[in-house]
Amino acid sequence: APEFYRLRIANQIINLSVDSTETITVKASYPKMSTGYTVSGSEECATIKDLAIKQINLQSFVIGIENNPAIGYDAAEDNIRKVIEQYKDFIKRNYIYKQPMKASSYFALFQALGQRLIFNPRESKEDIKAFAAVATSWDTYYPGSLRGENLHNIAIEGMKNVRIMQNKLAESQQGIDPSKVHTSNIIEIALPDNHGNMRRITDLVGKAVLLDFHV
């Protein structure tokens, strides 16, 4: 299985994927090595560079939205969410699902904005599918690899989390079961209804009642 490496000077990073049969040449100069480097000898490293530049552009765009004083907080959050979803959809279609066995597809799954992964394998059902696709492909091409097993574990854990959230949502939408509602230590109140008949609160358990207090 391929291994991943980083060349780093300060906050300038070059990501590489190396196969044991490859000889890779990297040329770069500080302080713009993250985007200005050239790499030869590895098609995958060239693809990873392409992905890294796309991620840098995405991050710059998101920061621009956050710093725009003309956009309110809610609108900014909504715009950022839409931009990220568009980015993920593009990466899935053009990289991950196209060649899930590639090191670049593995790399794409773990791209981040700040401390947050772009692909969310804990809560997003669609993102979990992407992790599962790469995991299955790596099982075929790199059987027994630690990275492939890690992807499987992430996908399985994500599916468990999604099921738990779906069950909780279903329970909340069903409402409260009246048979599970119990009363204790309540203050007994007796009031006349609109027909002049006295009604006690304890007589109305399980019923919807409108109380109209007026002077």
Model-derived features with residue positions:
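A non-transmembrane, solvent-exposed segment enriched in polar/low-complexity residues
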Residues: A1-Y95
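Glycine-centered tight beta-turn/hairpin loop motif at sheet-sheet or coil-to-beta transitions
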Residues: N11, N194-G196
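Amphipathic alpha-helical repeat scaffolds of TPR domains
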Residues: Q59-S60, P100-I118, E149, N153, ...
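Short coil/turn connectors between adjacent alpha-helices in alpha-solenoid helical repeat scaffolds
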Residues: A75-N79, L117-D127
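Amphipathic alpha-helices of TPR/Sel1-like and other helical repeat/solenoid scaffolds
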Residues: V83-K98, K129-D139
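Structural signature of alpha-solenoid helical repeat scaffolds
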Residues: P100, R122-E126, P143
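N-proximal helix/coil linker or "cap" segments that precede and/or mark the start of modular domains
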Residues: I128-P192, T202-V205
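Short active-site neighborhood of thiol/selenol oxidoreductases, capturing the structured segment around
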Residues: N197-V215
